[in-house]
């Protein structure tokens, strides 16, 4: 490979050299890379090899429709050439190359969208190894190089050289060196303390670690010495050449020459007499070794691949530092042929549900040729955490994004991928420990799938895990719940809320827990959306215990008692409804309360208190929806509670008792809070509570206080009793 080794000494003739300034953000990024200490500088080689691979992908892709593009060089490969004498490491590829405009734009004057984002990430403590994800991997060369020269030849342009020592500017000139044919050569002039990257062992280690599955041969060229047995004539020629090199050392040069001549004659005589006489000399040669002989892993038989190999491939594919959690390797044959390798990561990325960010988690190949890596049509959004490759035999190689959207083949591939992902999750669920890790990270995705994917809703519902009133610290499946249901239980009961403790202590679950009925605790906001779509499981309806019309398993005697209570408290319910007016739709006797005097439930198709809270938190909420979805509140009273019984007696004794009205409003507002709703006017409620505290402490309401401001506040407080003009209770909305 003489052309690669010679080009480090480019002849600097009088050709025109143009100087350009780096775009501000790029200059800033380079300064950051050069002036900050990073321990894992080795990633520069991964990034440059990755860029070479992309360039080779491009020329291969173009050659599929126009084979003449490869006339400038049929072989597609990457060569690595370390040169210890010149302290340079050269990366050569026979990819698409760059035109002069490409050189100027791509390497310096036009900032990539990721430049700023990467700098912000770096300053926030991100790892330098993430550089490739932001599209600025080339600049990682300056981690180890003081100067970088890029020589490139594109089919449509002349050969150009780009050079920069990162001082805020770079030069571009026509290159008059060795013609390349086509491709790009990146020459790194290494810093004095970075010569380890010229060592054969170190280069092999980095390529194996980061670039083992690159689809093109990566060949390392190393100059080595070996012993060679030669006859004395050849040895003499070799010695003569060495003498010429050492002409500066002239001391006693004549004597050895005379001796040599004599010895030569003697040797010739000996040689004629004894031809077996040989001599060993050191010979330099260039050793070529292909570093990535492993073929694309997804084309191999899954039975022949070890978990370590899958792990290595996963890391090279995703740049993840952790191993994958689970893997699915399969091929589909028949009318449609494709192979796929899918991985579940150990943890969810921090921006998993950022819609604006295009995910590039599944790479699409067609007959081993890379096509694209952010193909949104390949997998539904709720599975956007799955990483891997899909290699199709049937898609056309020159397929565009628009064609992909219409492609029936892609729809079939997508359907198969979803099916296999669900199989993978079901297999994972058999390993309790690993499934727990998976569920912690990706439960939201499963629930989003239930909301969005009606076809696979049943399978996805089997993957759900929840805490329940009977499960303690373990999460259980809906199937587990069904196996523990009581004989006469027809429904699956659930409650939604913010935390496990909050829902466990809720008034709504009192009677269910007393009767030994298990209640599912749904404590993630997405659960509200999930149960809107998941109406039933294995023929059992899912019923919210916070909504009206709760049916509990009860015998005839219990039903009779309940009817009697309804009749007894019918009058109180009517009085309370008249006092609360439009605040509630109706007041009824409850069958769900044990220790609480009352609670607020919502209509069957309205929002729960938790959903109302979630919707109020939406910045872009639709207030018209809020109006009709959140308005339907029902007050349920506990007929067995002493407060309610005393209130009934008080109301029946005197229908116009003002304290009844005050107490009903106080009960309603307290029930709102305990049922998870928010108060429209918390201050008035607070004043009412302070007044109750005063009564409890025996402080007379009319006592003048030392502080005038306190007196003013006291005057504003609504009295517990009084006529229509003075009672503020009536004004509370």
Swiss-Prot record:
One of its GO terms (cellular component) is mitochondrion. Keywords: Acetylation, ATP-binding, Cell membrane, Chaperone, Cytoplasm, Hydrolase, Membrane, Mitochondrion, Nucleotide-binding, Nucleus, Phosphoprotein, S-nitrosylation, Stress response, Ubl conjugation. It comes from the Eukaryota. ISGylated. S-nitrosylated; negatively regulates the ATPase activity and the activation of eNOS by HSP90AA1. Residues 230-246, 256-269 have a biased composition (Acidic residues). The keyword rRNA-binding does not apply. Residues 285-621 are annotated as: Interaction with FNIP2 and TSC1. Residues 629-732 are annotated as: Interaction with NR1D1. Residues 729-733 are annotated as: Essential for interaction with SMYD3, TSC1 and STIP1/HOP. Residues 225-279, 701-733 are annotated as: Disordered. Its EC number is 3.6.4.10. Residues 285-733 are annotated as: Interaction with FLCN and FNIP1. Residues 9-236, 272-617 are annotated as: Interaction with NR3C1. Residues 730-733 are annotated as: Essential for interaction with SGTA and TTC1. It is found in: Nucleus; Cytoplasm; Melanosome; Cell membrane. The modification Phosphothreonine is found at residues 5, 7. The modification N6-acetyllysine is found at residues 58, 84, 444, 459, 490, 586. The TPR repeat-binding motif mediates interaction with TPR repeat-containing proteins like the co-chaperone STUB1. PANTHER family: HEAT SHOCK PROTEIN 90 FAMILY MEMBER (PTHR11528). This is Heat shock protein HSP 90-alpha. It comes from Macaca fascicularis (Crab-eating macaque). The gene is HSP90AA1.
